[in-house]
C-alpha cells in the first residue's frame, strides 16, 4: 500500500519559520474536498516526519502508515520534520543552536497547523493533532495557547502522565534491575541528573553504562539547552486537565517507554469530570502504535526499539480502528 494509491494524493510542501525552513508531506483523499485534517507531531530527539529516527534502524515509520490510513478514511494529513530532524537538520541547527525551547517546538507546530489550514481542500474548523510521546506535550501546549487556529481535537499517543524525567528514570530503573550493581549505577545517574537540574556540569561517573552516558551527554549538549531542562519537568497530566476540546488518549499495553498504568492513571485522574476525554489502552500496541505479539514480560528496550520501524512492522489494528472511529465521530 502506497501513498500514491488511487484513492489518495501526496504532495511535498515547505514553508519558512524565522530564518529556517520546514518540510512536510500532505496526504489527502482524492477529490475536491473539503476534508477534515490531521497534523502529526513527532516524538523526541531526531525523529522525523515519518516517525523514523537515525538512531534506530528501519524506514517503516508509523506516521507514514497513519497518513495512508487516514486518507483512505477521508481525512487529509500533514506530517512535518522538526527543524532539528530530517534532511535540513544540519542547515537549521546552524541557526537554532542554543535556541531550542518548548516555545520553539510550539512555533513549529503552529506553523504546521497554518500550512495545513492553507490548503484549499482542508476544513480549517476540523483540524486535529495526532501526536506521539514528547509531541503530545507540544499538542497540548498549542491548544492551551489560544492559538489563531484552534484544534478540533487531540489524539495523544503515548503521552507521559508523569514528568518526562520521572518516566526516563523508570525506564532506566527497569533496565538496572536486570544487571549487577544496578542500584548503585542508578544512584550515580540520579547524582548526575541532580547536578544537571541545578545548572551545574553533569560530570557523569565513568562507571555508568555507555548508553546512559550518551543519554546524559545529549541532555547537556549546547544545542539542546535550555530545551532539555524544560522538557525534563514537562508533564502531560496538568495540561490535559485544562483542555476543553475532545481528546483521545492512547497508551498501548505493550509500550515499554510510557506505562499504561503508571502514566495512564495520572492522566485519568487529570481528566476526571471531562466527558470529552476518552482513554484507549490497546492490548498489543507499542510506543509507536505498532502491533507487538510478544508478552509484555518478554519485552526489553535492546530488542524492542530496533523493531519499531522494521519492514514487517505494522500498525496495531485495534488501535488504528479505534482512532479512525473516534476521528469519524468528531468530524
What are these regions (language model features)?
Residues 2-33:
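N-terminal cap/lid segment of alpha/beta-hydrolase-fold proteins
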Residues 31-34, 38-69:
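Short, surface-exposed "cap/lid" segments of acyl-processing enzymes
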Residues 97-119:
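Alpha/beta-hydrolase active-site loop
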Residues 115-121, 125-175:
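Primarily recognizes the serine-hydrolase "nucleophile elbow" in alpha/beta-hydrolase
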Residues 149, 155-239:
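Accessory cap/linker subdomain of secreted extracellular hydrolases
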Residues 243, 249-251:
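Short beta-strand/loop motif that positions the catalytic acidic residue
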Residues 245, 256-270:
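Short alpha-helix in the alpha/beta-hydrolase fold that links the catalytic acid
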Residues 288-289, 295-331:
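Catalytic active-site module of serine/aspartate enzymes centered on a nucleophile-bearing elbow/loop
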Amino acid at each position: 500500500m502506497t501513498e500514491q494509491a488511487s484513492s489518495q494524493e501526496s504532495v511535498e510542501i515547505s514553508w519558512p519559520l524565522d530564518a529556517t525552513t520546514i518540510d512536510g508531506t500532505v496526504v489527502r483523499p482524492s477529490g475536491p474536498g473539503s476534508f477534515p485534517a490531521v497534523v502529526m507531531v513527532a516524538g523526541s530527539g531526531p525523529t522525523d516526519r515519518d516517525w523514523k529516527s537515525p538512531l534506530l534502524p528501519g524506514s517503516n515509520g508509523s506516521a507514514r502508515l497513519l497518513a495512508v490510513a487516514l486518507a483512505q478514511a477521508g481525512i487529509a494529513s500533514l506530517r512535518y520534520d522538526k527543524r532539528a530532524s530530517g534532511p535540513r537538520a544540519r542547515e537549521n541547527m546552524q541557526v537554532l543552536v542554543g535556541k531550542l525551547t518548548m516555545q520553539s517546538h510550539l512555533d513549529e507546530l503552529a506553523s504546521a497547523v497554518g500550512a495545513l489550514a492553507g490548503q484549499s481542500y482542508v476544513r480549517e474548523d476540523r483540524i486535529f493533532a495526532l501526536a506521539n510521546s514528547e509531541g503530545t506535550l507540544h499538542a497540548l501546549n498549542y491548544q492551551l495557547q489560544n492559538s489563531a487556529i484552534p484544534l478540533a481535537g487531540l489524539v495523544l499517543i503515548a503521552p507521559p502522565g508523569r514528568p518526562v524525567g520521572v518516566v526516563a528514570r523508570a525506564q532506566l530503573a527497569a533496565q538496572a534491575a536486570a544487571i549487577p550493581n544496578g542500584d548503585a549505577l542508578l544512584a550515580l545517574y540520579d547524582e548526575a541528573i541532580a547536578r544537571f537540574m541545578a545548572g551545574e556540569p553533569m560530570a557523569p561517573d565513568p562507571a555508568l553504562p555507555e548508553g546512559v552516558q550518551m543519554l546524559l551527554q545529549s541532555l547537556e549538549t549546547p544545542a539542546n539547552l535550555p530545551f532539555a531542562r524544560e522538557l525534563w519537568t514537562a508533564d502531560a497530566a496538568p495540561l490535559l486537565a485544562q483542555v476543553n476540546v475532545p481528546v483521545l488518549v492512547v497508551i498501548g499495553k505493550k509500550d515499554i517507554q510510557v506505562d499504561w498504568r503508571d502514566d495512564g492513571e495520572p492522566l485519568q485522574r487529570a481528566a476526571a469530570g471531562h466527558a470529552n476525554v476518552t482513554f484507549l489502552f490497546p492490548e498489543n500496541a507499542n510506543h509507536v502504535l505498532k502491533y507487538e505479539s510478544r508478552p509484555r514480560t518478554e519485552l526489553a528496550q535492546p530488542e524492542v526499539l530496533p523493531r519499531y520501524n522494521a519492514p514487517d512492522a505494522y500498525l496495531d489494528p485495534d488501535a488504528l480502528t479505534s482512532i479512525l472511529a473516534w476521528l469519524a465521530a468528531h468530524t
